[in-house]
């Protein structure tokens, strides 16, 4: 007859902790990662399936490098998390079979492999968030006609947020190396607190980026209509949905994770949401690019996204009336053209007044 499990180890060696939670967590993570693989494959296909306009090539190369970075870091995290879960399960099963509880104590207090894997997870998740912020902020900055008063505050907020995340990751790595002392345990709790602040700050920053981007699209559309330029309401609504549905995924995932972790009252959740949050950080910006590219390759929208057809300012001066057709993928160009057209009209009005005075 097997001896009963000591009470202090019962939570670690329960069926839910040692069997159900690892299986459900890995299943959920690989389901989301499988979707990410399909999304990344769609991006690679659409990115190289047709030649981009010359003016968009620098941005295209930037987004390509950032998207590759996001996917590589997400893959590193998936591998590290898998090693962590499998190694922990092996230790738990070995302890249950041999009743060698010293093995469990050594794993929990000072296991070098566990420390390396945990550190790799924390660092890759923060670096992935940095790359995601870079991509989203750059797109927001371009859509806002490269205005520094929009880009600089977002960059500063992102730097502060990710610096907090790096500090939390370093503190947790130091604490996990040896948790046998009270000081190490206190240090680990400090790292957890900083990490919670990092997640909340990241949710706020990404929400601001999403709202600014969607707001600028709406404003540009209104300006286009006010200047008598024809545009597709359906296309604008689609782009707004793209921004809101994909850009807002990351802060929503963070908020849900924080709610689940802090409302379980010691009861383990159905699965660990931490890897889901990390993967969504890569999926959200990638989905924006992919959905925009897929939309630009469908039917009659291809010409609208590929080209910007507009009337030159000289044609206005000669009294010719033509229709402006803008691509939502070139919002900053459309905005600059609207502003330039307004300046031309103002100058023409001033010249007319001077002619009348003479």
What annotation goes with each model-predicted range?
Residues 1-358:
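Intrinsic-disorder signature of cytosolic C-terminal tails immediately following the last transmembrane helix
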